[in-house]
């Protein structure tokens, strides 16, 4: 059923490692795969670029890589958290990403990711958050955003006040943190902020929420928006929240017992195919693991990032 294809290979072409992958499919069925290309030690704060590879045959083969966001075009500091959204009406591809975890840009492609427009900053969108949270670090996604049936585009975001010291001397910390969203109703031209959904220290059904961050989104069959949230909470489960529009009136369902949290990026999407109940199944994938016997000395990780597993949910949950 599954076939492994090595799209990005570590320690080649000038980069030590590739992190934070993203994948999307255009209106014309071109597969776009992105990753942060990290030199040096491969850390969040290295001189990271974002590279892209395209497939014209449903992922069987991929064209040569292209650098779609080069840190040297911006200055010192990493490019990160690259998010793609295809507009399935016009075919335009919208890309949103961060530089130095403090400035956010968007750009467009009208040829299925072959080329992109010049980046334009969307600073005013994130300035709106300062009314509720004095952030110094911001990040979009990562992975991919979503487009609703109404045409609205939604990207989860996380913000930090930067007071943590876990990123080393001279770098702002990524903790403590909060989670929110941004949305666009004009095909990615302008963006507005959503409500803050949850904050570090919140009480979630008796469990303390610790450093919520990378969040993934999906529109459920009933039209509501589900956010699946990474955190460092000691319960080691993914946090689930719902909203009618992806921006307001968030309801935090709680931690999902079925979805382990190794403190790592995950992905979620809705299938294009209807099941026997005429509903589209939702697929969730992450490292389904709480062991910690492979972590190298000195790495600040709680669990090994291994054993990727696909969970299928709707109308009943089951795991494959």
Specify the residue positions occupied by each region the protein language model found.
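Single conserved hydrophobic/aromatic residue that forms the stacking wall/gate
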Residues: 310-320
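Beta-propeller and closely related beta-sheet repeat lectin domains
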Residues: 19-22, 78-83, 141-144, 213-216, ...
